[in-house]
Amino acid sequence: MINEATLAESIRRLRQGERATLAQAMTLVESRHPRHQALSTQLLDAIMPYCGNTLRLGVTGTPGAGKSTFLEAFGMLLIREGLKVAVIAVDPSSPVTGGSILGDKTRMNDLARAEAAFIRPVPSSGHLGGASQRARELMLLCEAAGYDVVIVETVGVGQSETEVARMVDCFISLQIAGGGDDLQGIKKGLMEVADLIVINKDDGDNHTNVAIARHMYESALHILRRKYDEWQPRVLTCSALEKRGIDEIWHAIIDFKTALTASGRLQQVRQQQSVEWLRKQTEEEVLNHLFANEDFDRYYRQTLLAVKNNTLSPRTGLRQLSEFIQTQYFD
């Protein structure tokens, strides 16, 4: 485990790409222990000058879309191109069972064994915001360790897609063709943040369905307002199982990066993502401090009970809580 005495040496080893040190650094960053948090802050501050040159990708898709098969085929393609690949799997655990929704890395056997690849799951335990914060910090560790491409994976449920879209350069929505109702299976909000839509499982007897789905998605994307002036989102097809179409996806990602880099938009997006991340973390930290105050916590619970019992309107409850905070902290 990394400690105060070994921090400088651990940073050196991390910069050299040592996998064991990277895993230890991730464990440190994930820890909620106050001493570990202070140490991980020093670690993250120290590696920031070495971050920013990595291509950040997000991949989402509903269960059954073949994400693990796709990521294995895609990751192995990148490795053959001479690149180092890290996969961070943000896992919004089931709110009912607490179990994992994402498959584990044993479904990516070849990629998991590859020396040029690193796979790390990030379970959320029902709190996606915390998981996305950790994923962002783990992504920075991978960048400092010299990985050329970092892929953040999540399932297409809840707010997981938009959370991931806010931390990556290029966001890919993995879909499968159905019986003509494909657009019902992808939310408008997701289409608005997707830079590429990839229809997987273009194999067997599914070619006609895939062609129909591709046309539907392309038509819908042309109606929606573009996310970037520099880029018209593309719809591509592939068979991850047969490893067909994977190289075309990589070429499209390169086209995307080239277009946004040339205009300066990519740098602007990353800067805005950092600002939004700081704002969100500030809000969470302020709330944590508020609820650590026993007087506020008690008053909040009383207000909440009154709102539940319809003896107080939510607007009045908000005003009273605001006045309480003003009195306690600002007067």
Swiss-Prot record:
Gene3D superfamilies: 1.10.287.130, 1.20.5.170, P-loop containing nucleotide triphosphate hydrolases (3.40.50.300). Binds and hydrolyzes GTP. Likely functions as a G-protein chaperone that assists AdoCbl cofactor delivery to the methylmalonyl-CoA mutase (MCM) ScpA and reactivation of the enzyme during catalysis. InterPro entries: GTPase_ArgK, P-loop_NTPase. GO terms for cellular component: cytoplasm. Transmembrane segments: none annotated. Keywords: ATP-binding, GTP-binding, Hydrolase, Nucleotide-binding. It comes from the Bacteria. It catalyses: GTP + H2O = GDP + phosphate + H(+). NCBIfam families: lao, PRK09435.1. Part of an operon that encodes enzymes converting succinate to propionate. The gene is argK. Changing residue 154 to A: In strain: RC101. ATP binds at residues 61-68. This is GTPase ArgK. Monomer. Interacts with the methylmalonyl-CoA mutase ScpA. Pfam families: MeaB. GO terms for molecular function: ATP binding; GTP binding; GTPase activity. Belongs to the SIMIBI class G3E GTPase family. ArgK/MeaB subfamily.
